Amino acid sequence: MLFWLLVLLILCGFLWNYKRQLKIANITDKYIFITGCDTGFGNLAARTFDKKGFHVIAACLTESGSTALKAETSERLHTVLLDVTDPENVKRAAQWVKNQVGEKGLWGLINNAGILGVLAPNDWLTVEDYREPVEVNLFGLISVTLNMLPLVKKARGRIINVSSIGGRLAFGGGGYSPSKYAVEGFNDSLRRDMKAFGVHVACIEPGLFKTNLSDPEKTAEKKLAIWKHLSPDIKQQYGESYIEKSLEQLKGTASFVNVDLSLVVECMDHALTSLFPKTRYAAGKDAKTFWIPLSHMPAVLQDFLLLKQKVELANPRAV
């Protein structure tokens, strides 16, 4: 009996994997729209899907990013300049995309644009330090989605929201994790709303990757700039040794981040082209083996493991 149960489980696993590998047909007549294509995941995704034969519409924040991308891709790829925090800019872009795709609609929307913002202890920050990541990562994503949604519904297509392991575990103060937690919530509600329309909504949760967004040198510079303007009381509580060690720790992350950005693009590819896409994708070994498993553990264990990495404060009782 146990033998046949084992055989059944192996067969089910084989059939499940086979099902996941089935692909859609006729990608050469399908349009996809990707935000945040100047650099990083979005740039690689635009170039990859252009080579595969999709009609790619790549949204770039800068003219230089747009020009560089067009120089590396085929005539099928079009770029638009887009600031996702500008509602009028988003509306104009959506109208332009509508004119491009016509009755075919938009097969894929990849919400990739995002920023890290300031990463520092919460008691160092002001409300304004939280605002920019939330405006870009959350409200920008929602704005683009709502404006493009009629086109995706017409094609019965796919929406792919790039979140982060920072949407599962908050490991630093600032607006990044709150914005990504909110993206996860929006993603879940949108997925359920769009089910009846035949639109599949997926979420990608990358681990730590080497991109412009997560450049440890820039992150350290921002943290040091905030430190210099803190009140004497806060500086006394944390101590000079804290800022020195925490900056070293930040810069040290460069040695263990994922460098292969294609791991994220492969998730996008599966979500776009599989007949049976997943609802969630973890990208990077750290996400799969540490961050995601840790997110399912009790808070007391999460705190124990994450606080072990924290730099000690000089005098936290000096309040």
UniProtKB/Swiss-Prot annotation:
Binding-site list for substrate: 164
Detail which positions bind NAD(+): 34-58, 83, 180
Judging by the UniProt lineage, the source's domain of life is Eukaryota
Coarse class of the protein's main subcellular location: membrane
Listed GO biological process terms: 9-cis-retinoic acid biosynthetic process; androgen metabolic process; progesterone metabolic process; steroid metabolic process
Location(s) in or outside the cell: Microsome membrane; Endoplasmic reticulum membrane
What catalytic reaction does the record list? 3beta-hydroxy-5alpha-pregnane-20-one + NAD(+) = 5alpha-pregnane-3,20-dione + NADH + H(+); 17beta-hydroxy-5alpha-androstan-3-one + NAD(+) = 5alpha-androstan-3,17-dione + NADH + H(+); androsterone + NAD(+) = 5alpha-androstan-3,17-dione + NADH + H(+); 5alpha-androstane-3alpha,17beta-diol + NAD(+) = 17beta-hydroxy-5alpha-androstan-3-one + NADH + H(+)
Keyword set includes Iron: no
**What positions constitute the catalytic site?**
176 (proton acceptor)
A molecular function annotated in GO for this UniProt entry is:
androsterone dehydrogenase [NAD(P)+] activity
Instruction: Return the GO cellular component terms, semicolon-separated.
Output: endoplasmic reticulum membrane; intracellular membrane-bounded organelle
Keywords, comma-separated and alphabetical: Endoplasmic reticulum, Lipid metabolism, Membrane, Microsome, NAD, NADP, Oxidoreductase, Signal, Steroid metabolism
Class in the EC hierarchy, top level: oxidoreductase
| Signal sequence extent | 1-17
This entry's Enzyme Commission designation comes to 1.1.1.209, 1.1.1.53, 1.1.1.105
Q: Does the keyword Transit peptide apply?
A: no
Quaternary structure? Homotetramer.
Q: What does this protein do?
A: 3-alpha-hydroxysteroid dehydrogenase that converts 3-alpha-tetrahydroprogesterone (allopregnanolone) to dihydroxyprogesterone and 3-alpha-androstanediol to dihydroxyprogesterone. Also plays a role in the biosynthesis of retinoic acid from retinaldehyde. Can utilize both NADH and NADPH.
| Protein family (similarity comment) | Belongs to the short-chain dehydrogenases/reductases (SDR) family.
Protein name (record): Dehydrogenase/reductase SDR family member 9
Q: Look up and give the organism this protein is from.
A: Bos taurus
This protein's encoding gene: DHRS9
